[in-house]
Regions:
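Short, surface-exposed loop or secondary-structure junction motifs
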Residues: 1-169
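Short, gly/Ser/Thr-rich active-site loops of penicillin-recognizing serine hydrolases
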Residues: 159-161, 194-215
Length: 215
């Protein structure tokens, strides 16, 4: 596990596996695609993926508390991920994750930094206006209410409200961050448990809809 430090280190986990279907036939989210994307970025920029994201995303968006930190070199105020055991006790997730995140996820960040990310992205400080539009374009329909853009989930909440969101989880950590374009509202929930973020996001979203904050 601790030998997984660069995108190339993840290749043996999937490179010899049989494809699920022909490319373009249907949609199936998979982390392996983001590992390959990280390798492309490294090839084009001649930089380690984590360094490129730090310089071109975190720094430009002024996400000063975020980074690809090693599990054995975390900032002092980092919330440690926890996994619940079958008997109801808890253990840390230090032996359940790679030593450092990869191009499929694993960065450390704060809710305030995620707001800076959304604002920077939506004001075209990170990408051009046309590229940003492609990011949020529904390139594939997932079900009756959800589509997928370029790395972003697009969900229709009701006839007049939608949200653009990113999410993820690993052992001992869960994350959900959404932008509601009708009101320009941002909601970010981070949890140091595997499923702690989802229920809270649902509750906040329901409250927003009931109170009419989106309108």
């Amino acid at each position: 596990m601790y030998r997984l430090r660069r995108p190339i280190d993840f290749l043996p986990l999937f490179q010899d596996q049989k494809r699920l279907f022909t490319a373009g036939e249907r949609f199936h989210y998979n982390n392996a695609g983001y590992i390959l994307l990280g390798l492309v970025i490294e090839q084009l920029t001649k930089q380690p993926f984590a360094d490129y994201v730090t310089n071109e995303l975190f720094a430009r968006a002024q996400m000063t508390q975020s980074g690809y930190f090693r599990l054995d070199s975390l900032p002092a105020d980092t919330a440690i991920g926890h996994i619940e055991n079958e008997d109801g006790t808890w253990r840390t997730n230090h032996y359940a994750l790679p030593i450092i995140g990869g191009s499929d996820g694993g960065a450390f960040l704060t809710a305030s930094d995620m707001e800076r990310f959304w604002r920077s992205l939506l004001t075209h400080q990170l990408l051009s206006e046309s590229m940003t539009a492609q990011l949020f374009h529904p390139h594939v329909k997932v079900n009756d209410v959800a589509s997928y853009g370029y790395g972003v989930w697009l969900k229709q909440l009701d006839a007049s409200h939608e949200k653009w969101h990113i999410m993820g989880y690993d052992p001992g950590v869960s994350f959900h961050s959404a932008y509601y374009p009708q009101s320009e509202t941002i909601v970010t929930v981070l949890s140091n448990t595997s499923d702690g973020a989802y229920a809270l996001v649902q509750a906040i979203e329901q409250l927003l809809l009931e109170k009419g904050i989106h309108t």
